[in-house]
Every structure is written in C-alpha cells, then in structure tokens.
A protein has these predicted regions:
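Terminal targeting signals and extreme-terminal segments of soluble enzymes
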Residues: 1-182
Length: 182
C-alpha cells in the first residue's frame, strides 16, 4: 500500500527529549517554503503523537512567526493544562534553533451531548456536475487537490476592483485519502 503524500508530509520522529523531528515535503511546496496548511498539520500531529494526549482535536491556532524553510524542523508540543475532559497545548516549530511557528491547540474527550447545526449545506451542483479546475498550478501543493469551483475564487485579473468574498467549491485530495475527523 502506498503512503499518501500528506501522511508523508506530516510524519514525525519522536526524540529522547520528547520533541519531534520532521521534514517539509516537496508535494506541499508553496511560493516560498511549504504550504501553511501542512505546517499546521505537522504542529497538530506533534500533539496527536504525544504520549500525554487526552481526547481529539477541537481547535488549532497557528502563528507563522517567520518563513518556514524547506527542510528539517523540530517540534515541541507540551500540555499547558489538563482538565477532566479538555487539554490545552502549546507548540513550537524550530529550524536551526530559531522559532519559526508557534501554535496553541485544544483537545477534548468527546461526550454525549446536544448538538445543533446552525447552518445548512448550500444548494450547489453535485461534484460530478462541476468541471475540475485546470490550467497552470505554479505551486506544488495546489496539484495535490481536485478543486471544482462553483462561485468565487481567485480573480483572473488583479485590477484593484472589489469582488465578493463568497467562495464555494468542491475540494478533495487528488490521491484519495479519508478525512481524519469528519
């Protein structure tokens, strides 16, 4: 079985001191350095692999302090506070001994509770009825996704005019991969 490129990109190795090492992945390269979404996923993966983990991820806030360079990095994840069912995390990503990214995360044990969907899925065509976005994809990470735009998207021309911020699209991995949390 082939390992998905996303799983390769977030792969970490635990060190004796409790930190993790990893590497950026060429499939998720952006204009300068790696795509920020994979940087965020790498930070969260350090939490998910930590031996003190409680529960599943609820939230993640990422601060890109400096440009992440292509290559090796170190991640330090530590629980800042653990309660009965929630856990708060602080995460640092370092390259060459310098902090390039910080993050905070909250994990929790899921319990039976009430739920309410405050917003419903918009009425849109089925994915098969929307043509896939094609053309030049200058950044490698864009090539990892099957994007089917419905409304909005990147303006074809940067002319200074204002456009609606509404964007609707179908998005999935080019190489199929199940969602981690749905």
């Amino acid at each position: 079985m082939t390992t998905h490129s996303f799983d390769e990109s977030i792969a970490l190795t635990r060190r004796a001191d409790g930190s993790f090492t990893g590497n950026t992945h060429p499939a998720y390269a952006n204009m300068v350095g790696p795509y920020g979404g994979t940087t965020a996923a790498q930070a969260l993966n350090a939490v998910m692999q930590h031996p003190d983990l409680l529960g599943e991820p609820l939230s993640l806030t990422v601060n890109f302090c400096a440009g992440v360079a292509d290559g090796a990095f170190v991640l330090n994840a530590k629980p800042a506070r653990t309660n009965r069912s929630t856990q708060h995390w602080t995460i640092e990503m370092l390259q060459n001994g310098e902090v390039v990214t910080t993050a905070s995360a909250v994990t929790a044990v899921r319990r039976e509770t009430w739920a309410d969907d405050e917003i419903s899925m918009p009425t849109v065509p089925a994915p098969a009825d929307v043509p896939a976005q094609t053309g030049h994809a200058p950044m490698a990470f864009i090539q990892q996704y099957d994007m089917r735009p419905i409304v909005g998207g990147m303006p074809l021309e940067w002319d200074g005019s204002l456009h609606s911020s509404l964007t609707q699209l179908w998005l999935r991995d080019q190489q199929p991969r199940p969602l981690d949390y749905a």
